Amino acid sequence: MTTIVSVRRNNQVVIAGDGQVSLGNTVMKGNAKKVRRLYHNKVLAGFAGGTADAFTLFERFESKLEMHQGHLLRSAVELAKDWRTDRMLRKLEAMLVVADAEASLIITGNGDVVQPEHDLVAIGSGGNYAQAAALALLQNTELSALEIAEKSLTIAGDICVFTNQFKTIEELNY
C-alpha cells in the first residue's frame, strides 16, 4: 500500500505521496511516483492501492475531466455513475485523492465520491497517521499546506511499514 495526503490552506492545495511499492511483505520499488498533475496542470491526483487498478481509475477519471472541461466534482460524479453499468469497475482495489482550486475529493474503487469535512484528506496504509498529524499541524501551527503535507507524510513513513520517506509532492496555488 502507500500513503497519500492532501492539504488545503491559504489558497494552496497540495497532494503528497510516498514512493513504496510492496508485493505482500516485500518492497519491490522505493521511488514510485504516485502523484501527478492532470487536465492542463489544473488538477492534482494521487493514488493508493493496487497499481493496475489505480491506473485504471486514473485513466477513467482523466477521460471524464476532458469530457467535462476539467470540472472536478462533475467528472468524479460521472465516473461514479459508471460503476452502475461497468462490471470491471465494481471491485477496483484502489483509491484516488483529487483536488483543484475549488475542491478536494476521494474517489474509491467502489464508486464512492467523498468530499472531506476538513481541508485535508489522507488515504492508504499510512493514511490515518498522516491525517492525524496533518490535522494537528493545521489546527496548531501556521505552516503552509506544503509544509504540513510533507511533515505528515514523514510521520506516516516513520510509523507505517508500507510507507517510505521518498516523497512526490505537487502543489497548486490559486
Curated annotation (Swiss-Prot):
Any one GO BP annotation for this protein: proteolysis involved in protein catabolic process
Reactions mediated catalytically: ATP-dependent cleavage of peptide bonds with broad specificity
E.C. designation(s): 3.4.25.2
A cellular component term, taken from the record's GO annotations: proteasome core complex
Ranges in a coiled coil: none
Keywords: Allosteric enzyme, Cytoplasm, Hydrolase, Metal-binding, Protease, Sodium, Threonine protease
Entry-linked CDD domains: protease_HslV
Cellular compartment(s): Cytoplasm
Residues forming the catalytic site: T2
GO molecular function, one term: metal ion binding
Highest taxon of the lineage: Bacteria
Top EC category: hydrolase
Gene3D superfamilies tied to this protein: Glutamine Phosphoribosylpyrophosphate, subunit 1, domain 1
Protein residues bound to Na(+): G157, C160, T163
InterPro entries: ATP-dep_Prtase_HsIV_su (IPR022281), Ntn_hydrolases_N (IPR029055), Proteasome_sua/b (IPR001353), Proteasome_suB-type (IPR023333)
Family recorded in the similarity comment: Belongs to the peptidase T1B family. HslV subfamily.
UniProt cross-references to NCBIfam families, sorted A to Z: ATP_dep_HslV, PRK05456.1
Task of the protein: Protease subunit of a proteasome-like degradation complex believed to be a general protein degrading machinery.
Subunit structure: A double ring-shaped homohexamer of HslV is capped on each side by a ring-shaped HslU homohexamer. The assembly of the HslU/HslV complex is dependent on binding of ATP.
Cross-referenced PANTHER family: ATP-DEPENDENT PROTEASE SUBUNIT HSLV, METALLOPROTEASE TLDD
HAMAP family: HslV
Name of this protein: ATP-dependent protease subunit HslV
Species the sequence originates in: Shewanella oneidensis (strain ATCC 700550 / JCM 31522 / CIP 106686 / LMG 19005 / NCIMB 14063 / MR-1)
Gene: hslV
